Amino acid sequence: MAPKAEKKPAAKKPAEEEPAAEKAEKAPAGKKPKAEKRLPAGKAEKGSGEGRKAGRKKAKKSVETYKIYIFKVLKQVHPDIGISSKAMSIMNSFINDIFEKLAGESAKLARYNKKPTITSREIQTSVRLVLPGELAKHAVSEGTKAVTKFTSA
């Protein structure tokens, strides 16, 4: 008897090795092939040198804070006392919050009086409305003093 030829099972290619063209043919007729990912306009990949000159770093956005002014006032009042970064952050948030409230109240007052401009009068009235009692009186007097000094200089 002659030896039988050995039968080997047909080797299947792994799915990863199939070319993209064959995959596109197997896609359903109604669907489009997936588009490649793109970056938003104006933003280039890190590897490409588009947009910026090579070697230059991107400039940081400056965030305006009142930290230096808070520190100056602290040193005027208590020269021997320091302030922690967390306390400084709280004070900065406090000032931003107060200014936001005063600006909102001043805008309302200007709208009520049908005026297009916020003047020192609206600011003074909003200080009286937002701040309580004695604090408002001191704030108004200090504000008036600052405006007088500014206009005379």
Curated annotation (Swiss-Prot):
Q: Which CDD domains match?
A: HFD_H2B
Is Acetylation given among the entry's keywords?
A: yes
An annotated GO cellular component: nucleus
Q: Which SMART domains match?
A: H2B
Positions bearing N6-acetyllysine = K7, K37
Provide the cross-link position: Glycyl lysine isopeptide (Lys-Gly) (interchain with G-Cter in ubiquitin). K149
Compositional bias, Basic and acidic residues, is annotated for 1-28, 36-53
State the Gene Ontology terms under molecular function: DNA binding; protein heterodimerization activity; structural constituent of chromatin
Note the InterPro entries from the entry: Histone-fold, Histone_H2A/H2B/H3, Histone_H2B, HISTONE_H2B_site
Q: Which superkingdom, per the lineage?
A: Eukaryota
- PANTHER family referenced in this protein's UniProt entry, alphabetically: HISTONE H2B
Its recorded name reads Histone H2B.3
